[in-house]
């Protein structure tokens, strides 16, 4: 499996894992500041970008092996791990499978999955139902806007829309990744020992904000940082604040 990755900066290793339909470009707003403090590793998940796109469906556990492959190829035995959305589910599988490879864990806008998962917000359910009837670019624009919070920075929706057009996901790869979002480690997360921070926007229309409370109740000692009024892509809405929160937690 060829997994495309890059490394920026020095310091303690920090692995970033993106979510559904986003390549490693999805971390761009926070890269410069993080790279001043850490050796930042980011990669394209299988099914997107410059990484291989094997036939799906994928599981989050399979995608976690890709993340471990990046650590191996980078010569990193142990790293801090930040995962967003589907990337947060992958990060959970990673730390469950190889707890010795994870120093501290940051789970962003994500879920533990399973029967206790709070339901997807109605706005996103309606959008998924309506999207097939819309012009593809209109649907994409709606999905971009839906992933932002109550008062996003001026021009951010335009910027993200343009980037999504420049970096279209492979349709089969997107479907294969989406299938991974239905897989989860189950009871195993109750034994996660890595210090864990859960970061969640209170206006997330994609992942129900109540998922943060469920995760915190499952992972021993987990801390929660709620970002008032921010949406699913809060690290695009307020990148500086996110870097500060993560850096203070990681040390």
Enumerate the predicted regions with their spans.
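Conserved HGGG/HGGXW glycine-rich cap/lid loop of the alpha/beta-hydrolase fold
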Residues: 4-56
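Active-site loop/oxyanion-hole signature of alpha/beta-hydrolase fold enzymes
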Residues: 32, 41-42, 46-82, 244
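Flexible "cap/lid" loop of the alpha/beta hydrolase fold
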Residues: 96, 103-132
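Conserved alpha/beta-hydrolase catalytic His-Asp/Glu region
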Residues: 136-189
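Short beta-strand/loop motif that positions the catalytic acidic residue
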Residues: 192, 198-200, 204
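Conserved alpha/beta-hydrolase "acid-adjacent" motif
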Residues: 205-211
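Catalytic histidine neighborhood in serine/cysteine hydrolases
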Residues: 213-233
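Catalytic histidine-centered segment of alpha/beta-hydrolase-like enzymes
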Residues: 230-243
């Amino acid at each position: 499996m060829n997994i495309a990755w890059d490394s920026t900066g020095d310091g303690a290793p920090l692995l970033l894992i993106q979510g559904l339909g986003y390549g490693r470009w999805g971390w761009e707003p926070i890269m410069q500041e993080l790279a001043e403090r850490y050796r930042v590793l980011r990669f394209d998940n299988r099914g997107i970008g410059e990484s291989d796109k094997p036939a799906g469906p994928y599981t989050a556990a399979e995608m976690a092996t890709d993340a471990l492959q990046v650590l191996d190829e980078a010569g990193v035995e142990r790293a801090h791990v930040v995962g967003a959305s589907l990337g947060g589910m992958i990060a959970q599988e990673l730390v469950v499978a190889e707890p010795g490879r994870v120093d501290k864990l940051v789970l962003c806008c994500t879920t533990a999955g399973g029967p206790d998962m709070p339901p997807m917000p109605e706005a996103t359910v309606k959008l998924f139902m309506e999207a097939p009837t819309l012009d593809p670019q209109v649907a994409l624009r709606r999905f971009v806007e839906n992933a932002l919070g109550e008062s996003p920075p001026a021009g951010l929706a335009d910027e993200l829309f343009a980037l999504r057009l420049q970096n279209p996901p492979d349709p089969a790869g997107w479907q294969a990744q989406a299938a991974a979002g239905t897989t989860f480690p189950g009871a195993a997360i109750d034994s996660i020992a890595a210090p864990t921070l859960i970061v969640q926007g209170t206006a997330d229309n994609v992942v129900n904000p109540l998922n943060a409370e469920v995760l915190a109740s499952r992972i021993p000692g987990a801390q929660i940082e709620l970002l008032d009024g921010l949406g699913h892509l809060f690290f695009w809405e307020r990148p500086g604040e996110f870097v500060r929160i993560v850096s203070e937690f990681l040390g």
